[in-house]
Amino acid sequence: METSINKYDPLKRIISFDDFDRGFCGWGQLVGNYEQSLDSMNPNYQQHTHPQLSNLSHWDSGSHGSWDGTYALKIQTRPITGSRNVSVKRLTFRKASRIRLEFYFTFKPEATELLLSETDVRSVGFLFDLQDPQESGNRVMPHIRFLNAENGEHVQKWQFKRKAPEVTPVGTDGKTITHDHLASEDWEDLPNGHQKLCYNEIPTKVNWHYLRFDFDLASMHMKEMQCNDRVFDLSQIESMK
């Protein structure tokens, strides 16, 4: 771990250090809420599948492997316009303090044809689903995404989401609700959020990008994000509640 950690800038205590050569490290499928029948699940959540451990195989020269090993966590979508997928890791916290998420990521379509296909991936992002520990505390859900392309055109900008969608009941027992907070509507542009991310000239190449996200659990506010060499001040950006 000592050498592997050098590519990150962690806070004082490391809660989770995920090396996917060791397995899924707690990451799994985000299953939509349901009651009594799977048919009661919101249709937009029914498309979610379990992530894969991938060595990034491709047809022209073999396998890329991960950033610094063999396996990466692959969150795959179906080859259908508008499809999406999410992987989730569920943790509770011991102290309401500043937390930091760091990871290296890459995104690309499957190389099924001899075309670059650089606008086939719509977006990639992350979110937290946090519960204020106070008795009357809010559910706070910071959402961040990189909008790579839209309608076949490059966009390449960071966005956030603060508007909560309508909550609907699930089943008949009155115990379960759902809301599609991952929907494509109501995303807002991050100020000065345009960023070009490196993309290679043939469809099988990948490039890894660094991302850091800081959040304060005490105040339940976003603080800062860094992607590669760009740093974004998020202190005035609202989270979904």
Name the predicted role of every residue range:
Residues E2-G23, E110, K157, P169, ...:
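Ligand-recognition surfaces built from glycine- and aromatic
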Residues I5-N6, S87-F93, Q195-P203:
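Beta-strand-rich interaction surfaces with strong enrichment in secreted/lumenal proteins
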Residues F24-K74:
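Extracellular glycan-recognition surfaces and repeat-rich motifs
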Residues Q29-G32, T81-G82, S235-K241:
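Predominantly extracellular/luminal carbohydrate-interaction, adhesion, and secreted-enzyme modules
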Residues H64-T178:
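Secretory/extracellular carbohydrate-interaction modules
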Residues L101, N207-L217, K223-M225:
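Short tryptophan-centered beta-strand motifs in secreted/extracellular beta-sheet-rich domains
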Residues Q156-R212:
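Short, aromatic/His-centered strand-loop micro-motif at the edge of beta-sheets
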Residues M220, Q226-K241:
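Short, solvent-exposed beta-strand-to-loop segments that form ligand-recognition rims
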